[in-house]
Design a protein with these regions (language model features):
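Feature captures the catalytic ectodomains and active-site-proximal regions of enzymes
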Residues: 1-187
Length: 187
């Protein structure tokens, strides 16, 4: 945050919001799209007003249904684009969602999950550079930067008392970080 505050063209403001549970990308990304209803199946596939939203093309379609001048793009497409390409992609747009995936890419893999805080720092720096480029090349006046979900992180190895024992046969969804069941938990 301090680094962003040093940028005279930046007025950073940090606020928290309520997140959907479980705290996973598929639920969080869907929550940030315009919608009347979200539905989640037992495999954590999420639909927004009945439409799939599991990839960039689907999210773009959902945004365009609200306004044909809305668009969903990937961070990589924009960060590597020259000024002409940026204008082509963004000129005349109403709302632009830019998806950046570095934190998930590193945090979801056991070999690199201990790098998640470093990935967050790098993501902030990369997004700040992109915002600077867009401001310079396109005179884009306002940016809202969000995260699709937070993360629960424990630096130390989990102890047995940190774990919950549950019959996986009655779970509708299991994951290394959570499980979903229709059964009540025991205290």
């Amino acid at each position: 945050m301090e680094r962003l505050e040093l940028d005279e063209k930046c007025t950073p403001k940090l606020e928290c919001m309520i997140s959907g549970l479980p705290s996973v990308t598929s639920v969080g990304m869907a929550s940030l799209l315009p919608h009347r209803e979200l539905q989640v199946d037992e495999k954590l596939n999420v639909t927004v007003d009945g439409q799939s939203c599991g990839d960039l093309a689907s999210r773009d379609k959902i945004l365009k249904a609200q306004n044909e001048n809305n668009v969903a793009l990937s961070f990589d497409d924009l960060i590597n684009a020259n000024q002409e390409r940026l204008r082509e992609l963004l000129q005349g747009r109403n709302i632009v969602y830019i998806y950046h995936n570095q934190v998930d890419a590193r945090g979801d893999k056991p070999a690199s999950e201990n790098e998640v805080f470093k990935a967050c720092e790098e993501a902030i720096e990369e997004i700040h550079r992109l915002v600077h480029r867009l401001t310079m090349y396109l005179s884009a006046p306002k940016f809202f930067i969000t995260a699709d979900h937070g993360f629960l992180y424990k630096r130390d190895k989990l102890q047995e008392y940190d774990k919950v024992s549950y019959d996986r046969e009655i779970c509708t969804c299991t994951n290394k970080r959570f499980l979903i069941t229709t059964q009540r938990t025991k205290d």
